[in-house]
Amino acid sequence: MPLKKLESSNNQAIIAEEVALLKEMLENITRRMIGDDAFTVIESIMVLSEKQDYIELEKVVANISNQEMEVISRYFSILPLLINISEDVDLAYEINYQNNTDTDYLGKLALTIKDLAGKDNGKDILEQVNVVPVLTAHPTQVQRKTILELTTHIHKLLRKYRDAKAGVISLEKWRQELYRYVEMIMQTDIIREKKLQVKNEIKNVMQYYDGSLIQAVTKLTTEYKNLAQKHGLELDNPKPITMGMWIGGDRDGNPFVTAETLCLSATVQSEVILNYYIDKLAALYRTFSLSSTLVQPNSEVERLASLSQDQSIYRGNEPYRRAFHYIQSCLKQTQIQLTNQPAARMSSSVGLNTSACPSPASLENPILAYDSPVDFKADLKAIEQSLLDNGNSALIEGDLREVMQAVDIFGFFLASIDMRQDSSVQEACVAELLKGANIVDDYSSLSETEKCDVLVQQLMEEPRTLSSAAVAKSDLLEKELAIYTTARELKDKLGEEVIKQHIISHTESVSDMFELAIMLKEVGLVDQQRARVQIVPLFETIEDLDNACDIMAAYLSHDIVKSWIATNRNYQEIMLGYSDSNKDGGYLASGWTLYKAQNELTAIGEEHGVKITFFHGRGGTVGRGGGPSYDAITSQPFGSIKDRIRLTEQGEIIENKYGNKDVAYYHLEMLISASINRMVTQMITDSNEIDSFREIMDSIVADSNMIYRKLVFDNPHFYDYFFEASPIKEVSSLNIGSRPAARKTITEITGLRAIPWVFSWSQNRIMFPGWYGVGSAFKRYIDRAQGNLERLQHMYQTWPFFHSLLSNVDMVLSKSNMNIAFQYAQLAESQDVRDVFYEILDEWQLTKNVILAIQDHDDLLEDNPSLKHSLKSRLPYFNVLNYIQIELIKRWRNNQLDENDEKLIHTTINGIATGLRNSG
């Protein structure tokens, strides 16, 4: 019997009960805001949407005034948000229940480690596995921070619903408090008035560390070690989960990311983790009242206690408290030294005896900052050893164990920050450096071989740098060198882990990587023997992915590269771009090209004695590589996950996965279990069959790519269709991120960034990037020979990659709505442009039919009943928003809305994204 999957809501009855209650409250609040007569409009359009009477719905919406639109669009935006909260609460409840009752579910870490423990290499795998979710600020999170905070309050209240029903707490008081928060969220601005700045993005993402991630990662790592120990495996400081960060370091296409934002990102992160430690030490101070008259501490604890400036007579016999006071004081000094910020959150209210006068002896021993997390951990270990010596092992568990585990994971830096820049920027900077140093006058005109020769020669000439104070530099070069200088300073101050990788967007050649090496050498981050920052190529387009193996084979052949990799435990990371490859070639071509590239790059690494690790640049939607995390990882090519995998978590996905600590724990658990299972599971499918499957896929994908590009790049009306029949213009003006919607002025599809591309197709409900070209390509293969449908059905049943590929298409099709898409098409100005819709419609119908045939299903989402039920309950609400959005766009484009009314469109964008749950 297959194990239960917890990735979506399961308890439909309790969810329906909660949603009915929330809806009743929202209705009462809305009636009071607009009156009973106006509320009848909401009721009537709700009925029309449920009946799918879209013609009449369109007429009713067209007669709603701009003023009425504000509350109506708000109502239908808040309602799916409340449904989301209820489903999230149910998932958190289910996770706790399954764990507390020791029930098995898919991806449960206890099962994964139990299965692994009996294998010869089980301990090695558990020691080495490292999964790194990298949080990014990609602009797909449309919710304001204030709305997210109110959402959290409602979530916490709904967690108490079962207790309220059972009478454990007052049901009436509970309802009153819930009503207050629903009223607040209904009457709070949904849309940001100003565009986010990078500093806002840094601050916003930090709330997830404070609220859930630090606790979840720490708890999960402790459980990981305990489970291994249960099976006789003593692990030495494993790190199954560490965190990554792009915000503040990702400057590709974002001119607002500078040396200052990089420094701010690292400093804020350090401040957050040090505050966490300081708070934990305060809690330990409060609870560790052990008296030396009853328990004799060891000499090291006595030494720490003697250094404390808390010399109150009330603490004379409490050496552990004084030791914790001293450690905390050292942490405060560390925070001042590393961040130039005192521990502002700390006060006497947290239990410290801040009023105690320091003794003369303590003034002779001023508090010193820790030189490193190792020194901090050593003091904690001394206390642990003293407790063990006295038989107090039970006292180690809890806060002391948690903070000791946290310092192993987070150090003083919290999360490693990636730097990223486009290859063209680096080339321009290196060309300027070479010209200024009178080495090459026109570097960009050189052949690839000539470029590499020049670059390697410069890298071998130590310690010579190319820049000189006597030579004027462009603003671009000054800015780039400042960022790299800041990176070096941060590594010197916070440790090597704070910045470990630099990613090169649009890597197209070996010289792209050596150009970055030159820039790093300029500030002392690279020399002949060592690269303190790993150079990570990002292969994004179909063409670049096809060329990746040749590029990496040539790069790995250089002696200087071998030296760099040798100092990095023989790892070379490669980032794979799901978004641009999809925009370039369509869903099938992207998925298959990425799959093949991983196989081939892994083989190249083995030839050179290098462990290739992959960084998956996924988004939330299927069109950007999204989908269920467990399935995505376990369907990776066999052998492609050695022991380390990184993946981006961005936008609305961060809130969905890490909004509370229970769900965060579960999603991190899924990532670890999926990675281990993919590492150790033998190839399920027969190897001879796999070869034939690959031949079939090569043929199908070639057709799919051609069909996709014929419409997107060859149809002269497609560009206008996208810009007129979707809210792309309105999305681009929405204040959801610091980064521009395009790297440059948009004159063609290739110039548009992948996120607004996918986001806009989600809004008009076509979901184009997640399926277009799939149906025709499969149909051609099926029609080619008798038995081909059966071959595809067999592939679906036996090949995890193919099964995941089609399941994602199934999910995307279920969220699309061609009736609504038709109405968006009417926004186009000419019939030729509107006719593009019919090409899309034909392919959509064909894709749906073919997918169902291969799956041998009668309807979409047969394998995912919980998602099917969830969509059924929420679709009527945000379908209404689409019709409201279409009407508002008509008015806006016909100058029937003023600038203040533009935010009405933004409200609908917000609501639709909320209802879909994965928007970009």
UniProtKB/Swiss-Prot annotation:
One cellular-component annotation, GO: cytosol
Pfam families for the chain: PEPcase (PF00311)
UniProt-listed Enzyme Commission number(s): 4.1.1.31
The UniProt record lists the keyword Magnesium: yes
Keywords from the UniProt entry: Carbon dioxide fixation, Lyase, Magnesium
Listed PROSITE patterns: PEPCASE_1 (PS00781), PEPCASE_2 (PS00393)
InterPro entries: PEP_COase (IPR021135), PEP_COase_bac/pln-type (IPR022805), PEP_COase_Lys_AS (IPR018129), PEPCASE_His_AS (IPR033129), Pyrv/PenolPyrv_kinase-like_dom (IPR015813)
Cystine pairs: none
Function noted in UniProt: Forms oxaloacetate, a four-carbon dicarboxylic acid source for the tricarboxylic acid cycle.
This protein's name: Phosphoenolpyruvate carboxylase
